Amino acid sequence: MMAAAVEEEEMVERMHGWARDMDVASRRAEEEAMRRYDAASWLRSTVGVVCARDLPDEPSEEEFRLGLRNGIVLCNALNKIQPGAIPKVVQAQSDAAGPTDGSALCAYQYFENLRNFLVVVEDLRLPTFEVSDLEKGGKGVRVVDCVLALKSFSESNKTGRQASCKYGGLSKPLTARKYFILKNTDAFMNKIMKGHSAEAIQSEFSEGQSIVTDFSIESNEMTTSDSLSILLRKVLLDKKPEEVPLIVESILSKVIQEYEHRIAIQNKMDEEEQNLLNITEQVNHVVVNGDGEVKQFQLEAQTNFDVQQKQIQELKGALSFVKSGMEQLRLQYSEEFAKLGKHFYTLSNAASSYHKVLEENRKLYNQIQDLKGNIRVYCRVRPFLPGHRSLSSSVADTEERTITIITPTKYGKDGCKSFSFNRVFGPASTQEEVFSDMQPLIRSVLDGFNVCIFAYGQTGSGKTFTMSGPKVLTEESLGVNYRALNDLFNIKAQRKGTIDYEISVQMIEIYNEQVRDLLQDGGNRRLEIRNTPQKGLAVPDASIVPVTSTADVVELMNQGQKNRAVGSTAINDRSSRSHSCLSVHVQGKYLTSGAMLRGCMHLVDLAGSERVDKSEVVGDRLKEAQYINKSLSALGDVIASLAQKNSHVPYRNSKLTQLLQDSLGGQAKTLMFVHVSPELDAVGETISTLKFAERVASVELGAAKANKEGSEVRELKEQIATLKAALAKKEGEPENIQSTQSSPDMYRIKRGNAIPAFPKNRQPMEEVGNLEVRNNATPMQKKASFQFSGVLSENNSSDLAENCNGIQKTDRMAVGNNQFENGNSILELEPGATQLPTFFYQRYDPDKQRRRAEPVETDDSDSFDAATSSPSDQEMLLSTSGLKADGIASRGAFIIKKPQTKNTKITATKIPNLAMKSPMSEKRLQTPIRNSKQLPFSTTGGRRTRNGKINTPK
């Protein structure tokens, strides 16, 4: 009986040990979880939820390890406790990467953070851990201990006293250990006492619980089997004998169940052991068989190694051979490269020489153009507009001086037509390229030449863009106007020590055949174009503003552009509805010699020709288009007449041709920009424009001449003007004598006959630089037959004669053998001689002129006052063919006819001559006789009638 009880007691003790092991493991896992939760909670509260977003509030061991393995949370927590402990914390590369994918930081980055953290923790003498503890399979308990020690250290720093737990884990009070013991006891007792009466079990368990509750901390160190034995003895000691079998039976049933369970486990373990033995036998068999295979593999490997070793030796030999061959090739190529370098050097020198020769040829070509006086024509192709790019272009090819147009069959058989000009700019050309090619022409204005640049083409072809630029200006998009003026002011600054320049600007427009001033806001006052411009001013009534810098000119141009007539059509949303002209007047004075020079530059932006069916204009826009096309048609007629060298040039058909008369027919350097559009639907207008440009390029104007005059000539002209004013005042005439700065339509008398001075008969180049009174005379419009009907009288007042005594000898007029020789004036004033001539000219008879075979005639024959020209700055040309001889006064005074307009009576004005002390006063003019039809001047003062008879005045 007692032996059975002992066996049962031993069985119970074994069962209790097994249960105790399970409970201890469970308790330990729960304790570790609580410590881990505490550490995670403290880290989240210390560094913040955002920084510790990868660390849950109650993490598992794997989540805790992944949340701390990059070291960011640990380093930030340590910096919170010890500011600046870790100066640099390597942050994650991407916040978007999850913490569990293993790609947030590279191994080096989180190893750097962890190493810095462990160094600081070790310096603080706190528990540390290894970096491998944060890897999978590491000891996470040491990490938790380190975090909790850091927490205790932080709390001690805050409170100023040492914490209850010295840098360890959670502090466990005594009640906690009692709690776990009671819990384990309850589990065991519930297991072994099931099935007994509730009252007995409860009473006995209460006694056992009271005993266990009184245990001290030292009694908890006792083994569990001893305590259970004592407990069972106490329970069975007081029981009745009849109750013991029931209790023992219950315990035995439980033991039997446990035994059967263990037997099942043992059987399973035996099966696994048998399987393990089988596997071991198989492994041994494989090992035994594998020894032969290994030996065979080693033999094959050795053989392969020997073969590869041999191949390596062969490769080393081949490499040595290749190296020697490469060295030879290197030397050979070095020699070849040296030869190529010399050859390229020769080619580069040849190319440089070629470019120099090409530049010299261009300069020579420009000089030839200057000598011939051809109008230079530059062609520019507009690029496609944004959003309107066509699939194909009408421009087939562009070269330096040639443009080829794809034409329909009606324009050519081969489908292409080429045009040649002085320069051709493609669609990709810039404003800088366009201006650089014409820059020498611009600079000649400061040398005293007149220059005219005008843009021609259909509407929307880019004329305003070339001349002015786009609506929003940039440094790269500035047009010809701005760049030309900027260049003028730069040269002015460079020559300020030699020449003193004064620059002034005019800006006008021709709108519906009306000349308007663009520099006056709201100024619709109609201006007139003078056929004999004074001081280079074709429109003297327009505002002329002095300028000193490019900024002043830009401001004036902006004001003019605002006042210019601009409208929108179906072809162009910013179409110019008028012709604009920017005139830049330059007057310079040499600081050393005092000589004067004068130049003028006209920058003309023509309105584009347009077809009404395409532009879809109505009303005022239609009227504007009609005026524009009419003026451009008149320009075409003028160009055609000049190209064919016709005797009649219709300048007066339009205000535009009147304005350009001095540039097209005078002594000026002229450049025309012709613009074409690349669209296929505009090929008709393109070909028409290019044909017109070809006609313009064929016009020869003769060599241009600089407007220069010496200081002595200028002083003499001023004296003559003063004397003329005094004479006019004395005779009671209106003081309308003006400074002689331009040459009217006069005739130069040569030996034997009279030759009209036409614009194309310019002075030779050797006379260009002479400092004499040469001005841009307005071309003569019609050849007038003038009658020289008076000479200076000899009975003038003595006071005027005294005013003329200081005039030096400036001109000479030799009379005899039908010859006039002209220097700077008609008459030669010797010392002591006094002459005050005033010439008047009679308008010729058109009918009679057509009956006679005369030289070239022009269209502009407006009368002008002879007082506006002086004998000191003009070359007088007299045509004696068909002259009407006026009677000469008996006392030697000539009667000279003034020019008359239509339906105006011809009046004669007698001008007395001053007393002449020189032999000049004794001479009489002899009229040169060209042919038998000419009649000599009558010395009796009579005049010839229509039938050839001479009426003598009574």
Swiss-Prot record:
pH sensitivity of activity: Optimum pH is 6.5 for ATPase activity (in presence of microtubules).
Molecular function as annotated in GO: actin binding; ATP binding; ATP hydrolysis activity; microtubule binding; microtubule motor activity; minus-end-directed microtubule motor activity
Annotated ranges, domain Calponin-homology (CH): 33-155
Compositional bias ranges of the Basic and acidic residues kind: 844-855
A biological-process GO annotation: microtubule-based movement
InterPro entries, per the entry: CH_dom, CH_dom_sf, Kinesin-like_fam, Kinesin_motor_dom, Kinesin_motor_dom_sf, P-loop_NTPase
Domain named Kinesin motor: residues: 374-699
Tissue specificity statement from the Swiss-Prot or TrEMBL entry: Expressed in primary leaf, primary root, developing flower and coleoptile.
Stretch list, region Disordered: 844-876, 912-954
Record keywords, A-Z: Actin-binding, ATP-binding, Coiled coil, Cytoplasm, Cytoskeleton, Microtubule, Motor protein, Nucleotide-binding
Binding site for ATP: G457, Q458, T459, G460, S461, G462, K463, T464
Start-end of Low complexity biased regions: 864-873
Polar residues bias: start-end ranges: 928-954
Chain coiled-coil ranges: 704-733
Intracellular or extracellular location(s): Cytoplasm, Cytoskeleton
Signal peptide as annotated in the record: none
SMART domains reported in the protein's UniProt record: CH, KISc
Protein family membership: Belongs to the TRAFAC class myosin-kinesin ATPase superfamily. Kinesin family. KIN-14 subfamily.
PANTHER family with a match to the protein in the record: KINESIN-LIKE PROTEIN KIN-14Q, KINESIN-LIKE PROTEIN KLP-3
Descriptive protein name: Kinesin-like protein KIN-14Q
Biological source species: Oryza sativa subsp. japonica (Rice)
Gene expressing this chain: KIN14Q
